[in-house]
């Protein structure tokens, strides 16, 4: 397959995504096919975002690593020493993707490391490995193009996470601000009693202990539930089951108490 055809194959994957998140596993599969190498997309912390195997490596440690989708911490950190594409590293290199305990089996193993950079920061690493055949310029062009695409996708995901976090925080703040003074007091006592993100409590007992009416507790819970911050369900005589749905809620509630 010529370079242009291989590039088009990668482009076809991006176009088929049509604005949706690119699946790192599919991306790895396509890279594996066009570059004809084992492909590992590794995050900054060593998480295996995606991988595809062209040549099986029979090694228990490698199998466990793939099953756990996590690269060793020491190896992951060492990858940051590589700031530009390093190709055709042999099995004696500290950066080899082949198991060092089986060097004699993978004497012809070659590894190429491509930094994934976006927004001026290191986002991860693309690791390619194959036996025998050297990585040529065409392979490196495809690898660097792929790393750019992966970098853009990681940046997009990070931006979405930040946006979602801000939205969750805003929802919580609005829900809390909708509570009256007595309702807020009731909620503080409820979650002191709950001491976690979910559990069972008896509203009447809290009302009696704090000196507020049960209706205040019911109204407060209803407001938080309608905002999607919590889920509550009456279990009759047993009490009320409460579960926090928004992970920003308890943090914002704690901030109010310290102010």
Swiss-Prot record:
Gene Ontology terms describing biological process: negative regulation of DNA-templated transcription
Any one cellular-component term (Gene Ontology): cytoplasm
Domain of life: Bacteria
Subcellular location: Cytoplasm
In-chain residues carrying the UniProt-annotated modification Phosphoserine: 215
Function comment: DNA-binding global transcriptional regulator which is involved in the adaptive response to starvation and acts by directly or indirectly controlling the expression of numerous genes in response to nutrient availability. During rapid exponential growth, CodY is highly active and represses genes whose products allow adaptation to nutrient depletion.
The protein's name in its UniProt record: Global transcriptional regulator CodY
Lineage, opening ranks: Bacteria, Bacillati, Bacillota, Bacilli, Bacillales
């Amino acid at each position: 397959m010529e370079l242009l055809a291989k590039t088009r194959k990668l482009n076809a994957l991006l176009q088929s995504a049509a604005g949706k998140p690119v699946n790192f596993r599919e991306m790895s599969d396509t890279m594996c096919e066009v570059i004809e190498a084992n492909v590992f997309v590794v995050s900054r912390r060593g998480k295996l975002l995606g991988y595809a195997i062209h040549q099986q490596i029979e090694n228990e440690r490698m199998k466990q690593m793939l099953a756990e989708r996590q690269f060793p911490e020491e190896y992951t950190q060492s990858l940051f020493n590589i700031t530009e594409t390093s190709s055709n590293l042999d099995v004696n290199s500290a950066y080899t993707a082949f198991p060092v305990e089986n060097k004699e089996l993978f004497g012809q193993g070659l590894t190429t490391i491509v930094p994934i950079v976006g927004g001026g920061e290191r986002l991860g690493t693309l690791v390619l490995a194959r036996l025998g055949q050297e990585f040529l310029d065409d392979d490196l062009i495809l690898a660097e193009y792929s790393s750019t695409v992966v970098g853009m996708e990681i940046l997009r995901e990070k931006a979405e996470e930040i946006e979602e976090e801000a939205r969750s925080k805003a929802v919580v703040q609005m829900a809390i601000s909708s509570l009256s003074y007595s309702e807020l007091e009731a909620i503080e006592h409820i979650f002191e009693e709950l001491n976690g993100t979910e559990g069972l409590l008896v509203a009447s007992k809290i009302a009696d202990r704090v000196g507020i009416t049960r209706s205040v507790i019911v109204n407060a819970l209803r407001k938080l539930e309608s905002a999607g911050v919590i889920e509550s369900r009456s279990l009759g005589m047993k009490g009320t089951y409460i579960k926090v749905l928004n992970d920003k809620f308890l943090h914002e509630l704690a901030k109010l108490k310290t102010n």
